[in-house]
Amino acid sequence: MLETIHETHVVPLGIGYYTVPEAARLLRTAPRNISRWLDGYSYRGADGNMVKSSPLWRAQLPRLGDALEIGFRDLIELRFVLAFLRQNVPLNVIRRCLENARAIVGEERPFSTHRFRTDGRSIFLESLREALPAGSAEDGSAVIDLKTNQLVFKQVVERTFKDLDIEEGLVVRWRPYGGKPSIVIDPARSFGKPLAADFGAPTSALARAAEAEGSTKRAARLFEVPVSVVNDAVGFEQSLMAA
């Protein structure tokens, strides 16, 4: 469940606020992955020397000491990164795609834009070509790879954008419970905590109430919301725990 914002940390309104563990829970990934992608990391190269891998982008929120905290747009960009990785797209291709998309879209976080939804295929395929090993175009393996990855891109974009709301060219909301309208993550509301969309109650509070009361009906009466809303909140919170 989302943690309380540090008392001394002033978060600009409308951006959203997530600690690394909170974001990892919503994205169903390990916290270390988010830290590596947004903080960078080091690894030992083939020659035995340490190599520094830079962050994929800079987080929306300023650092408070050593703590990495991210905004809503960061969360959605990370969701795309994960979607590509889960389709076996290498991280170096994703990094190149981000760089190329930034230059074309003009946004630091280009995946969470309408422009990437419409023009991203060509950006992705060009990034893939640039990342292909030398000589693969001559032996024909590039053709197979590009055809396969056209389908990969289509699947990632269709699945990832289907539960996102876009306004003025940018992703502004995420409906994280299978796209159902009852639950929303909106950076303009409660710092981006998952909420019952029409009532504003945090899903975590609804789920806790249902557990404490031993009944979704009693929790619904307590919060003055329909039982179906509590059921969805409980289902959503349980899905995060099971991930």
Regions found by a protein language model. Give the residues of each.
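Cytochrome P450 catalytic domain signature, combining two hallmark sequence patches
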Residues: 45-48
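Long, charge-rich, low-complexity intrinsically disordered regions
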Residues: 1-36, 42, 52, 65-70, ...
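Carbohydrate-binding surfaces of carbohydrate-active enzymes
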Residues: 53-57
